Structures are given as C-alpha cells and as structure tokens.
UniProtKB/Swiss-Prot annotation:
Taxonomic superkingdom: Bacteria
UniProt entry keywords in alphabetical sequence: Ribonucleoprotein, Ribosomal protein, RNA-binding, rRNA-binding, tRNA-binding
Stored HAMAP family: Ribosomal_uL5_B
UniProt protein name: Large ribosomal subunit protein uL5
Species of the source: Lactobacillus delbrueckii subsp. bulgaricus (strain ATCC 11842 / DSM 20081 / BCRC 10696 / JCM 1002 / NBRC 13953 / NCIMB 11778 / NCTC 12712 / WDCM 00102 / Lb 14)
NCBIfam families, alphabetized: PRK00010.1
Cellular component annotations (GO), alphabetically ordered: ribonucleoprotein complex; ribosome
Complexes and interactors: Part of the 50S ribosomal subunit; part of the 5S rRNA/L5/L18/L25 subcomplex. Contacts the 5S rRNA and the P site tRNA. Forms a bridge to the 30S subunit in the 70S ribosome.
C-alpha cells in the first residue's frame, strides 16, 4: 500500500506547485529528498549509558537504527577526545520518511506546549528546513515513565527546491503548521 503522504504529493501537490510556479515538467517540482534526525548527547562523555538511551529513543521515534556520531576534534575544555561517541543520527528516505513527516505534522507538533506554529525563518537559503525539538516526549512512541531525562533533537527536512519560497510552499502543501 502506498503511503498517504506520497499519494498526496503525486496527486495534489505536484499539480498545485506546477500551476503556482509555472513549471514545464513535473520533474521540476521540488520534492522532499530526506529527513535527518540528529540528537547530540554531550553528556555521553561522562556517562556512556546516556548515549545508549538516546539511541534507543531515536530508534523508537524513527523506526530505524541510528548511526552513532563521533567527535571530529579533541576539545580539552569539554573533556572531549577525537573519536569519542557524542551523538546519534538517522537519515530517513522513502516510505519511512513520509510516515515520519505525517506523524510529525499530525501528531507530534500539536503536542508541543504553547504551540503557535513552526518558525518560517529556519530555511537555509537552498530550500532545506531545520526544526529543533526541545523534548522527545512529544512523540507518541516515547513512554513518559521510562524517560529519565528530556533530550532535544534536530530535524532537517532536505528538499530538492532551489529557493526557500518553493520549499516553504511544498511544506505548506503537506500541512506544515507555519507561524503566521
């Protein structure tokens, strides 16, 4: 069965964007390339168990095993050595990407306290959107009782759009709740 967001993209979003931006081919229409979830665990330097918990939570959120990120340089002030494990990241593509986007827009973002929409200023100038989440508890898979501390994560939505305007329109069509 095809994903509802993938179907929505092909049947509704492509024609709407083609009309708005006057594309000559459906291949010119921007699409979401991948979604990257990154969780930096700075306190993993002192306690490696914190990294394991972060990896477990990221696995639950994404449905995919994360890659452990390592320090590129040694920083003495942070008691950090090159090659130490300091975070985890997951790259979602295809159906898992659309599933996650659907869950993010319809379930997780509305659960954020005092939510008034996501910032429109988080585009990078090349059509990619970055979103920071302060606590992982907004995701339905995370059990509140099993969490020993709140961790934030970064969500980067990489699109094939050439401009921020195109990317914003693409995400708006998917239902991303931008702040007015």
């Amino acid at each position: 069965m095809a994903n509802s967001f993938a179907t929505k993209y092909n049947e509704e979003i492509v024609p709407a964007l083609t009309k708005k931006f006057n594309y000559t081919s459906s291949m010119q229409v921007p699409k979401i390339d991948k979604i990257v979830l990154n969780m930096g665990v700075g306190d993993a330097v002192a306690n490696a168990k914190n990294l394991d918990e972060a990896v477990e939570e990221l696995t639950l959120i994404s449905g995919q095993k994360p890659m452990i990120t390592k320090a590129k340089k040694s920083i003495a002030n942070f008691r950090l050595r090159e090659g130490m494990s300091i975070g985890a990241k997951v790259t979602l593509r295809g159906d898992r990407m659309y599933d996650f986007l659907s869950k993010l827009i319809n379930v997780s973002l509305p659960r954020v306290r005092d939510f008034r929409g996501v910032s429109t200023r988080s585009f990078d100038g090349r059509g990619n959107y970055t979103l920071g989440v302060k606590e992982q508890l907004i995701f339905p898979e995370i059990d509140f009782d099993k969490v020993n501390r709140t961790r934030g994560l970064d969500i980067v939505i990489v699109t094939t759009a050439q401009t921020d305007e195109e990317a914003r329109e693409l995400l708006t069509q998917f239902g991303m709740p931008f702040a007015k």
